């Protein structure tokens, strides 16, 4: 594979990863009912969330460990894809692994 093809592949994959909506951190309000985004009338109406102020940082500190433990399926797939691509790009052209 030519260097320009590798660069194009890396560019396309990086654009796909950065444009993906799955990267956005979402909170399930059924699970985290006291999260700042899930509080009040604005959250119940589904409109734009209101800024909660000083307690938002404290609430995020409490919910972040739970959010990290529930890694989305898309994130795992993208991580696996990036490992495969790193392995593919690290081998010189024409070199393949041989299994005995």
Swiss-Prot record:
Keywords (A to Z) from UniProt: Cleavage on pair of basic residues, Disulfide bond, Neurotoxin, Secreted, Signal, Toxin
Any coiled-coil regions, as ranges: none
Cellular component GO terms held in the UniProt record: extracellular region
Propeptide: 44-100
Disulfide-bonded cysteines: 29-38
Similarity comment: family membership: Belongs to the elevenin family.
Protein name, UniProt field: Elevenin-Vc1
Source organism per UniProt: Conus victoriae (Queen Victoria cone)
């Amino acid at each position: 594979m030519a260097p320009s093809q590798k660069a194009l592949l890396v560019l396309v994959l990086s654009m796909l990863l950065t444009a993906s909506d799955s990267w956005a951190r979402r909170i399930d309000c059924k699970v985290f009912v006291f999260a700042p985004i899930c509080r009040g009338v604005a959250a119940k109406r589904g409109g734009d969330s209101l800024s909660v102020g000083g307690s938002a940082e404290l609430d995020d500190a409490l919910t972040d460990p739970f959010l990290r433990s529930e890694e989305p399926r898309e994130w795992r797939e993208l991580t696996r894809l990036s490992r495969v691509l790193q392995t593919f790009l690290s081998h010189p052209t024409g070199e393949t692994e041989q299994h005995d």
